[in-house]
Structure formats: C-alpha cells, structure tokens
C-alpha cells in the first residue's frame, strides 16, 4: 500500500511543512535555446502554487520536468521525495496539460473508467463525473464535445486517480465564467482534502483567487515569488474607475496615466499615483461619476515585473 501525502510528506518530526516538488538549480535547453536558467522552485504540501509567465517563459517546461516528461540538462528535480519518473510517485500525481489528446470515439464514462484502471486507489467514477460537472455528458463521445466540455473531461482524468499532487496547466482555457468558477471550487475542495496543486494560468484573476503562493517566471528565470498580496505590493500603482464624457484618447494623454481600458459604460485608468490624475480628471469633467480608486491588482504587478525583467536584460 502506498502511503498518503498526509502520512509522509506534509510534516517532518519538527512539524515543519514539507516540500513535495522542487527544481534545484535546474537548467533546460532546447538546442541553442535555454528554456530554464538555474531555476530554484519549491511546492509545499497542502498549498496551491500559481506559476505565471508570458508565453515561452518556461512554465510548461518546468511542469514537464516535474512530471518526468523531460530531463534537465543540469540541476535536480524532485517530486514526492524522489525521482518524478518513479512509478510509485507517478501513482500519486495527476496532470492536466494544455495539449491533452485522448481517443475521440470513447464516451466520457469510458475514458474515466480507463484512466481509473491505471491507479491503485482511484476515486469512484460518479464522484469524478460530479466534480467535473459531467454527469449529463457521461455517455457522450469525446469527439462530440465542445472545447470547454473537453477541458472538463481532461480535468476529470487528472483527478480520477485521487492524486496527492496535481499539476494543472492552463486548466480553464475555453471555459465560460460559470464553468471556470465551478472548477475553482473543485480545486479548493481538493486542497481542503490535503491535496497539493501546481497551477499555470494566463488568467491573473484565477491565480489571485486560488493561489497561496505565486511564482513569476520570465525568460527562463524566477523573477518574483510570494503570496498574491506580496506580489501586488511590489507594484506601487493605483486603478481608477469612473464614468466620464471624456474620450479614451483624452484619458490616455493625461500625465501619469499608463493604461486605459473600457469596461462597459465606465473607464478603468491605471497610474502610479492617483491624486494628480484625479485632480486632472475632475478639472476636465466636472460631471464625472461612479468614481472608485483601488490598489493595483495582480495583473498590473505581473506586467510591471515582466517588463522590468526584460528591460534589465534578464534573458
């Protein structure tokens, strides 16, 4: 019988939380391209870690190394206390990758039954179908599903083995808002059961809502790491939301404004300092309404960090 994550990986004799996945000084090259450069990265038991970065930053490479699908050129890769290719460790991990290819002629329930047969202690098929919101699609062939429905099947296949460590690479791509939030709730429930989740996503709101810790990777290097609030605190910016008769071009010309977005009837204005921009706005439009000022979000912090990294020559 394989011990559970709670038995062997969550605490040591001193009660400290244990690392269940790590990259230590890892370098990975694809020919002349260096995808990861001396990366040090850890995932602790019972947490959700979001790995964020632009396209080509090294996120998927890092995940594939931890899954044992790639080998590092140098450095050490550890998962659940050992080699990621170890069969016992693979029994305790689940993965949902961006490119998940399964036979299109099999029905949803058949896929779940097939994948469950690979594991020693799988979840009941009914529980997997419910967790992925697939109860009404269990007899549908995979090839007849929409893109969002296929994503939900791939999530079901990732969790059917009752994994202790779950890798989710862009899990909510193609999902509508309701389905995305349902998946978030399922991830929270898994963590509540003692599971550990490593998540990559382009949806910054998703990382903000789910992650205990965020690591930002750019051009193969980890450039920032901390809780979502700690990452956001690294960017001293403000977000101004208002309803105004001013045009978007006029708003963009106001000194101190770094970005303007239209959001239904209102505008969202980003700036390092709110007060001078507010004075300018009110001077230009005395009828301005719906005014809200808030701290910069994770998206602004992410953009600032990756742009600064590129400017400083982190290649």
Which ranges hold each PLM region?
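Alpha-helix boundary recognition
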Residues: 91, 130, 192, 208, ...
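Structural motif detector for alpha-helix initiation sites
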Residues: 108, 125, 228, 295-298
């Amino acid at each position: 019988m394989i011990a559970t994550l709670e038995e062997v990986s969550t605490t040591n004799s001193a009660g400290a939380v244990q690392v269940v996945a790590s990259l230590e000084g890892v370098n990975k090259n694809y020919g002349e391209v260096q995808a990861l450069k001396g990366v040090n990265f850890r995932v602790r038991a019972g947490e959700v870690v979001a790995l964020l970065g632009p396209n080509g930053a090294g996120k998927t490479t890092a995940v594939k190394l931890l899954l044992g699908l790639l080998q590092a050129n140098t450095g050490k890769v550890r998962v659940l206390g050992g080699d990621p290719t170890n069969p016992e460790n693979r029994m305790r991990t689940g993965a949902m990758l961006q490119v998940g290819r399964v036979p299109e002629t099999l029905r949803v329930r058949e896929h779940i039954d097939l994948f469950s047969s690979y594991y020693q202690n799988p979840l009941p098929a009914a529980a997997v179908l419910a967790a992925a919101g697939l109860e009404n699609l269990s007899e549908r062939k995979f090839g007849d599903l929409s893109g969002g429905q296929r994503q939900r099947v791939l999530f079901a296949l990732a969790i059917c083995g009752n994994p202790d460590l779950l890798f989710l690479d862009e899990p909510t791509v193609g999902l509508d808002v309701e389905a995305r939030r349902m998946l978030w709730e399922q991830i929270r429930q898994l963590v509540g059961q003692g599971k550990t989740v490593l998540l990559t996503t382009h949806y910054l709101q998703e990382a903000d809502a789910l992650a205990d810790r965020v690591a930002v990777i750019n051009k193969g290097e980890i450039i920032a790491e901390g809780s979502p609030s700690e990452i956001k605190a690294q960017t001293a910016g403000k977000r101004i939301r208002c309803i105004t008769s001013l045009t978007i071009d006029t708003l963009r010309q106001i000194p101190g404004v770094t970005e303007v977005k239209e959001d239904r009837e209102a505008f969202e204005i980003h700036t390092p300092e709110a007060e001078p921009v507010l004075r300018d706005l009110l001077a230009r439009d005395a009828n301005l309404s719906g005014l809200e000022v808030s701290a910069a979000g994770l998206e602004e912090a992410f953009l600032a960090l990756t742009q600064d990294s590129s400017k400083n020559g982190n290649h």
